[in-house]
C-alpha cells in the first residue's frame, strides 16, 4: 500500500496514473499487488519476487517514487525481504512502514539495515522488546479486541 500527497508528484511516464488535484492535507491511497494471470501471488515453486516481470517491477518503482509512504505487512518482509526503495526510475525513496502487531520483523531485514529511507515499525510490542537498529522508529499501537491494529493511524504519517 502506498500513500501519496500532492507535494511529491514527480514527472511521470504515461502509464503512471495522474493524481487528482487535492489539498495538501488530503491523501491518496494506492494498493499494488503482484499476481499472475491465474490470480496467484507466487509461482508454483513458491517464488514471489518479480512475479509481474520487468514492466511490472518498473511500474512498482514509479509508484514508490510517486509516494510519500509505502506500507507493507510483516508477512511480506518475512517472505520477500524487500528494500521498498526506488531503484528503476528517478525519484526519492518513500518512508517505509511495516505493520507488525506481534513483533516478528527479522532484525536482519534489508529495510531495517540499509538506512536508504526513514523506516517505521508499527507494533503492539514495546520498542524495548524488539531487537531493531537504533535508526528505526517503533510506534507502539494498541490492538483491538480481535488482535488487529487500526489502519487509521497510517493517515497521519508524514515523510
Regions found by a protein language model. Give the residues of each.
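Active-site ligand-binding patch in enzyme domains
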Residues: 2-26, 30-37, 41-159
Amino acid at each position: 500500500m502506498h500513500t501519496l500527497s500532492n507535494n511529491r508528484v514527480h514527472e511521470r511516464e504515461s502509464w503512471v496514473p495522474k493524481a487528482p488535484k487535492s489539498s495538501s492535507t488530503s491523501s491518496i491511497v494506492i494498493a499494488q499487488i503482484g499476481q499472475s494471470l491465474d490470480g496467484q501471488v507466487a509461482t508454483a515453486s513458491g517464488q514471489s519476487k518479480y512475479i509481474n516481470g520487468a514492466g511490472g517491477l518498473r511500474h512498482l518503482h514509479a509508484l514508490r517514487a510517486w509516494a510519500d509512504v509505502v506500507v507493507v505487512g510483516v508477512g511480506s518482509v518475512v517472505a520477500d525481504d524487500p528494500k521498498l526503495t526506488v531503484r528503476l526510475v528517478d525519484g526519492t525513496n518513500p518512508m517505509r512502514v511495516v505493520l507488525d502487531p506481534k513483533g516478528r520483523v527479522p532484525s536482519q531485514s534489508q529495510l531495517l539495515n540499509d538506512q536508504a529511507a526513514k523506516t517505521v515499525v508499527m507494533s503492539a510490542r514495546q520498542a524495548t522488546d524488539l531487537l531493531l537498529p537504533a535508526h528505526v522508529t517503533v510506534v507502539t499501537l494498541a490492538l483491538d479486541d480481535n488482535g488487529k491494529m487500526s489502519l487509521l493511524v497510517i493517515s497521519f504519517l508524514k515523510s
